[in-house]
UniProtKB/Swiss-Prot annotation:
It is found in: Nucleus. This is Sex-lethal homolog. GO terms for cellular component: nucleus; ribonucleoprotein complex. Expressed in gonads and somatic tissues of both sexes. In the ovary, expressed in the last egg chamber of each ovariole. Highly expressed in nurse cells with low expression found in oocytes. Highly expressed in testis with lower expression in testis sheath and vas deferentia.
Length: 321
């Protein structure tokens, strides 16, 4: 609810001397946000930000800003990443908070493009480097509801930042952030962790995402903890790199050099005649062949089922700090 240009129901702890929220409903109409957010973050991250930026022009409309959230490629001095945002925080709240510092070009909280689930971080691109630096100095570490946010410059994307986000299952249903830090923190600097919880009860689901600062740290954690029962746990953990959106998974369903359900016949295709199609070998299409084809169809069907029910995993974000 908005009253007099101030957003009510928010408990931000602002530094002393800062004004109230500069946002008002007349400043920006966020109802025109695209519904499909969180496109592929890997090689298509720049295109995603260009297509889905929330450019805030001087008149407050959705601007086609070329200085969009593009992983800091061209605006590393003005583009900020904000971590540890409250799960229910909205884009307009993020804008309202940072607008107290100065004019903003773009801002967005990153979400799953199908479910709208917040990943707990976002980007804010200021109009000037001075305002971006002042935002870090004034807003980094403040409490937003129950979260202490982290504000820093967005790092340029790079190959060295890939494979730093881990997907962990078989965790205890009573796992806490502190326990997760204890288990994984010894292998490197954890820059983000997110325990998935039941939306009705709030209890952990035994699944978490953990992002390390470096790929080597993530790989060390995988080597040390995958298929290992942690202290206080009852099941071996499954620890692997979180999949990127858009990555093909078809190859995992068919093992190479291993025919499924039945043997392929040994008939060979005949040679191509001059102008005529050669005949296939007589033993090529027999009952064994038909069984093999049926087996392949069943295998593909199961693969499609597995693919359709597989949960989309947190996409790669090259700017996660």
């Amino acid at each position: 609810m908005y009253r007099g240009g101030r957003m009510w129901g928010m408990s931000h702890s602002l530094p002393s001397g800062m004004s109230s929220y500069a946002f008002s409903p007349q400043d920006t109409d966020f109802s025109s946000y695209p519904s499909t957010i969180g496109r592929q973050h890997s090689q298509q991250s720049q295109r995603y930000y260009q297509n889905n930026n929330c450019g805030l022009g001087s008149v407050g409309n959705m601007a086609n800003s070329t200085n969009s959230l593009n992983s800091g490629t061209n605006n590393s001095g003005t583009n900020l990443i904000v971590n540890y945002l409250p799960q229910d925080m909205q884009d307009r709240e993020l804008y309202s908070l940072f607008r107290t510092i100065g004019p903003i070009n773009t801002c967005r909280i990153m979400r799953d493009y199908k479910t709208g689930y917040s990943y707990g971080y976002g980007f804010v691109d200021f109009g000037s480097e001075a305002d971006a630096l002042r935002a870090i100095n004034n807003l980094n570490g403040i409490t937003v509801r129950n979260k202490r946010i982290k504000v820093s410059f967005a790092r340029p994307g790079g190959e060295q930042l890939r494979d730093t986000n881990l997907y962990v299952t078989n965790l205890s249903r009573s796992i806490t952030d502190e326990q997760l830090e204890t288990i994984f923190g010894k292998y490197g600097q954890i820059v983000q962790k997110n325990i998935l919880r039941d939306k009705h009860t709030g209890t952990p689901r035994g699944v978490a995402f953990i992002r390390f600062n470096k790929r080597e740290e993530a790989q060390e954690a995988i080597s040390a903890l995958n298929n290992v029962i942690p202290e206080g746990g009852t099941q071996p953990l499954t620890v692997r790199v979180a999949e990127e959106h858009g990555k093909s998974k078809g190859h995992v369903y068919m093992a190479p050099n291993q025919p499924p359900h039945g043997n392929m016949g040994h008939g060979n295709m005949g040679n191509m005649g001059h102008g005529n199609m050669g005949m296939a070998g007589g033993s090529g299409m027999n009952l064994n062949n038909m069984n093999a084809f049926n087996g392949m169809n069943q295998m593909v069907h199961r693969g499609r089922q597995k693919h359709s029910y597989q949960r989309k995993i947190h996409p790669y974000n090259p700017n996660f700090l």
